[in-house]
Amino acid sequence: MTKDELKKKIGQRIIELRTQKGWSQSDLARACNKDRQAVEKLENGKVNPTLYTLYEISKALGVSLERLVE
């Protein structure tokens, strides 16, 4: 798997988990202290998230880091 494929896969997983909670991008952004545009870029695979960003997102979504990136 390439780096770009991995970023897109993680982005799709974030979308899936976020929508399961009934959250908008703004809701997730508030919960993990990011702005909506940052969440949008993550979900679209436009940026390479840091481990800490992934941790914050998993914590906000109430899932393990492992589940977020599986």
Question: How would you describe each model-predicted region?
Answer:
Residues K8, T19-Q20, N48:
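Short amphipathic helical patch at the helix-1/turn junction of helix-turn-helix
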Residues Q12-A31, E56:
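Short basic helix-loop element that most often maps to the first helix and adjoining turn
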Residues T50-R67:
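DNA major-groove recognition helix of helix-turn-helix/homeodomain DNA-binding modules
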